[in-house]
């Protein structure tokens, strides 16, 4: 198979939440295959995009299209973390409503291409609470808020909805990562790692490959799909 199929040279890729845990790795990965990457976030990026504000999304999208002419791939990466957040409304607003807002507004301006959503294994399965016993991160108890699980399950449903709505011109898919190592407490990392078939948490750069696949012509017949990237955690009981 020709490497050219995986080539995203001069494709315009919009990434939300680009300064978060995984965002910088996604930016790096897409730049490595020749894409024009537009990294956005609520601060510290050239183009500011707040996924909870439709006005912000419209303003940012118009700037991008004026500069580059089009958007080929949208990556809905912005999210409220599930480490210890407890605010139901804010988590839903960012993770679920934010994904909806961007998919609706930016998708309507895309002529063709790919939308890739980012969910979580907690959108598929319930938490194993034993992992979080006596686990603290930045001085706060770790856990999985109900809003986080509900929002990520909703993202999976939205993926199928927009895949149906935008077919056949725009493909819409979802990646479903498991735990990403981010200097969590050693006790948590050890317990979590024993739950996976690969015996470890994911590195920050190990989700980006699936995004490249879903943005490229290698996945030209893939839409409405969820790619689970969890080291086999959800594949066994």
Can you describe what each PLM-predicted range is?
Residues 2-4, 130, 134-135, 212, ...:
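Short C-terminal tail/terminal secondary-structure segment
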Residues 5-37:
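Canonical Rossmann dinucleotide-binding motif of NAD(H)/NADP(H)-dependent dehydrogenases/reductases
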Residues 62, 94-113, 119-126, 160-168, ...:
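Amphipathic alpha-helical dimer-interface segment in Rossmann-like NAD(P)H-dependent oxidoreductases
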Residues 77-82, 232:
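Conserved NAD(P)H cofactor-binding loop of Rossmann-fold oxidoreductase domains
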Residues 80-84, 116-167, 180:
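Catalytic loop of short-chain dehydrogenase/reductase
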Residues 86-101, 116, 148-151, 155, ...:
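Catalytic Tyr-X3-Lys loop
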Residues 167-171, 222-224:
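Short, small/polar-rich loop/turn modules that mediate ligand/substrate recognition or access, typified
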Residues 196-207, 218:
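A conserved structural motif in NAD(P)-dependent oxidoreductases
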